[in-house]
């Protein structure tokens, strides 16, 4: 572990702090073209910083996300309320042995679970649930060895089988935009008919096409990533015959520009199965 980069900073609880320094640029005809101009998670320095932040957060009981350690926990009230609702509806009628199952696809080192676990601790409550993070090999393997708990487990995207398990909630936080074929993944998720799908920190714009560009991260999180900017109209049309929109909201990252004349906003939404 000596080769890990120790985060030399903490940032306080300021909304949109990460996104203010991020930049979207370019317009690419396909994913491979954008990927060839990006560093992505394959950059060893980025991976090391993510690992180091996760270990610091675990040791010091702090919140972390995207390789950044925060001074204060960043709670997701929409997600935490959803989990409570799902447990009451899906589990309580069947007794304490019924486990609420949550799939966190592309969930990094489990920061969403970390804030949820702290949320439970704040109120001195607990219930029977499992939280599975699915990530690329290098993240999943590290998580299994260093971050996993009784409630939190990690699986590799390469080995993950959508058909193997049924989930009550699927969490997609800052995930879909970084997948080469996001709607193929959504198709597989919807085939399993989870009760709820939680989407957050995802970029949308009002145009009619899904755009591909590059997200250049800030100086604290070096690197760049190919990313989708989804057409909000097309996205809603994809879901509307399969699920019902429960709520949609603006994410903390807020507004952004991805060309001189085009802008978008990071949004979140919760869909439920009737």
Question: What do these predicted regions represent?
Answer:
Residues 100, 168, 195:
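Conserved acidic residues
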Residues 168-182:
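A short SAM/SAH-binding and catalytic strip from SAM-dependent methyltransferases
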Residues 193-207:
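Conserved beta-strand signature within the Rossmann-like core of class I S-adenosyl-L-methionine
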């Amino acid at each position: 572990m000596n080769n890990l980069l120790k985060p030399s900073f903490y940032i306080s609880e300021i909304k949109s702090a990460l996104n203010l320094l991020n930049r979207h640029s370019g317009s690419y005809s396909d994913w491979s073209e954008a990927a060839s101009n990006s560093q992505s998670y394959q950059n060893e320095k980025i991976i090391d910083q993510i690992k180091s932040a996760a270990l610091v957060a675990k040791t010091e009981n702090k919140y972390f996300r995207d390789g950044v350690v925060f001074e204060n926990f960043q709670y997701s009230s929409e997600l935490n309320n959803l989990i409570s609702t799902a447990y009451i509806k899906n589990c309580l009628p069947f007794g304490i042995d019924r486990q609420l199952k949550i799939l966190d696809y592309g969930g990094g080192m489990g920061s969403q679970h970390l804030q949820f676990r702290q949320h439970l601790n704040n109120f001195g409550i607990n219930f029977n649930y499992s939280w599975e993070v699915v990530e690329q090999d290098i993240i999943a393997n590290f998580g299994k060895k260093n971050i996993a708990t009784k409630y939190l487990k990690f699986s590799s995207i390469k080995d993950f089988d959508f058909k193997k398990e049924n989930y009550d909630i699927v969490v997609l936080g800052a995930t879909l935009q970084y997948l080469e074929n996001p709607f193929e993944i959504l198709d597989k998720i919807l085939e399993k008919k989870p009760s709820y799908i939680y989407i957050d920190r995802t970029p949308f714009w009002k145009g009619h096409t899904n755009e591909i560009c590059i997200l250049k991260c800030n100086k604290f999180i070096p690197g760049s990533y190919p990313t989708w900017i989804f057409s909000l109209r097309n996205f809603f049309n994809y879901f509307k015959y399969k699920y019902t929109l429960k709520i949609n909201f603006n994410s903390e990252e807020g507004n952004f520009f991805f060309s001189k004349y085009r802008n978008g906003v990071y949004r979140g939404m919760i869909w439920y199965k009737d």
